[in-house]
Amino acid sequence: MMGQNQTSISDFLLLGLPIQPEQQNLCYALFLAMYLTTLLGNLLIIVLIRLDSHLHTPMYLFLSNLSFSDLCFSSVTIPKLLQNMQNQDPSIPYADCLTQMYFFLLFGDLESFLLVAMAYDRYVAICFPLHYTAIMSPMLCLALVALSWVLTTFHAMLHTLLMARLCFCADNVIPHFFCDMSALLKLAFSDTRVNEWVIFIMGGLILVIPFLLILGSYARIVSSILKVPSSKGICKAFSTCGSHLSVVSLFYGTVIGLYLCSSANSSTLKDTVMAMMYTVVTPMLNPFIYSLRNRDMKGALSRVIHQKKTFFSL
């Protein structure tokens, strides 16, 4: 329980973004617009997949869960950022901070696992097209989604419980716009070696292994594509996984840039900008990537609009 924790502080202070006072209103409007775009874009994908029977396939089951994850991922941090910018109150209660950290880890990790499931789906579709329906059965797809939720829930809960056992005294200023786990560890008064070891070990399992699995899937995909005799077949195969590859590059590019390429003397501003990329920009762009480069999504949108027009004309 929170009351049993040995903390001597009741809340933290989020420094937020390094924005000049005269730019506050403009930045507030910008982030609000980006957040609303993220909500509407991902909700549109979820609704289209739900309403259009043509999209009731394994790929779009994973995509609907990915859109839900993106929607929630942004909702974990951006509303609090907007509230702090509007009220000029940077405080966040201790329990709320740990809750935010938990859901941030949960939905961030969930996206990583769902991208692996989608890569496997594309691998089966291209390398074993005749056996696709048999391999990607509804039972397997639901099992992959359920396993993703279970593993990410366990991982997020593990880090949250380890953080809750730490003692925080005096210094409660977090140089970030959300309760980042690494920033919280720097404020801890007690020994954090267990936390750091778990981050190192679990980080490899949650981020590195999924990334390697995706690379392995695409290596097999490229190998199979190069065996296709016609250039038309090659283009069709690449277009099948183009959207997913774009999302993978966007997600892992920002995460790797933040956690693997950051040096000891990297600035807080740089870390904040990189974090903003994968918490705000990436979830906002994903719906555009899947809608603009995906004929199935465009067709589904046209059919749903046509059905609504027909309904209202009756």
Curated annotation (Swiss-Prot):
CDD domains: 7tmA_OR1E-like. Keywords: Cell membrane, G-protein coupled receptor, Glycoprotein, Membrane, Olfaction, Receptor, Sensory transduction, Transducer, Transmembrane, Transmembrane helix. One of its GO terms (biological process) is sensory perception of smell. One of its GO terms (molecular function) is G protein-coupled receptor activity. Residues 1-25, 80-100, 159-195, 260-272 are extracellular. Residues 50-57, 121-139, 220-236, 293-314 are cytoplasmic. It comes from the Eukaryota. It is found in: Cell membrane. GO terms for cellular component: plasma membrane. It is a multi-pass membrane protein. Glycans are attached at residue 5. Gene3D superfamilies: Rhodopsin 7-helix transmembrane proteins. Pfam families: 7tm_4. The chain crosses the membrane at residues 26-49, 58-79, 101-120, 140-158, 196-219, 237-259, 273-292. Belongs to the G-protein coupled receptor 1 family. Odorant receptor. PANTHER family: OLFACTORY RECEPTOR. This is Olfactory receptor 1E1. The lineage of its organism: Eukaryota, Metazoa, Chordata, Craniata, Vertebrata.
